[in-house]
Amino acid sequence: KMRTLKSIMVLGLALSTFTATEAAKLTFKVTNPNEKVKVILTFNQSGEQKEVAIDAAGNGNIEITGFTPQYVTMQYTRGRRTLYLDPNQDLTLSFDSDNMWRNTTFEGAGAAINTYLGSKELQSLGMPDMKMQEAALIHRGDSLYAANCQVLEAAKLPADFTAQEKIRLQFYTYYYFSKYALYHPHFGKDDNYIPSKAYYEKLEAITPINAGLLALKEYKAFLPDAISAFSNKGK
């Protein structure tokens, strides 16, 4: 009898653990849907992909379990954007199929963070900046990063997300900085350009070597050119 009671208690515990599993419920509302195309969600930490079918009326939903809060890349037709999903937070996403990357509205517990991530105010160095002189480029990068951090702070989001996002913003903002030695000779019409000590010092300051950061797609994109730039130092 005691054994049966123990079995029931163990089973009860297993069931309560099972029912308490955190699941993020995502609901999609798509205008002008393309039924042949699914929403693809790529989890940046694991690389795992989830697909969500969108029906003729533009509706789709999915419940996702077994993940920690993290950045996720969403793709639909040709558009893509960065999301932040949390297993404790439901999210409703509404967009036009042709305009998802530019304009998605969010509702639910995860709305504030994801609305911020789509902010038009976030800016980064770009190809046109490659013609700038070094000092001007460093100043512009620093100014953009400071402005991006202000946008983040103004959003008043949870502290743990804000701390992570400041790191992600660094690689987002300075993505082209690591490519400067590659592109400046052409765009700056300066074939004799050799990166200065100040350039390498700045590059070193914004390039932590940390395997834990490989969960950020921005870091993975930034790192190879930074390593390449360091390997050419003194050549």
Regions from the language model: what does each represent?
Residues K1, S7-L11, G118-E121, Y199, ...:
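Terminal low-complexity, poorly structured segments
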Residues K1-T27:
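Bacterial Sec-dependent N-terminal signal peptides
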Residues T4, A112, A136, R140-S143, ...:
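Exposed alpha-helical structural elements
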Residues V10, A14, A146-E153, L157, ...:
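Generic surface-pattern signal
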Residues E22-Q164, R168, F177:
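A non-transmembrane, solvent-exposed segment enriched in polar/low-complexity residues
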Residues K166-G234:
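Extended amphipathic alpha-helical segments with heptad-repeat/coiled-coil character used for oligomerization
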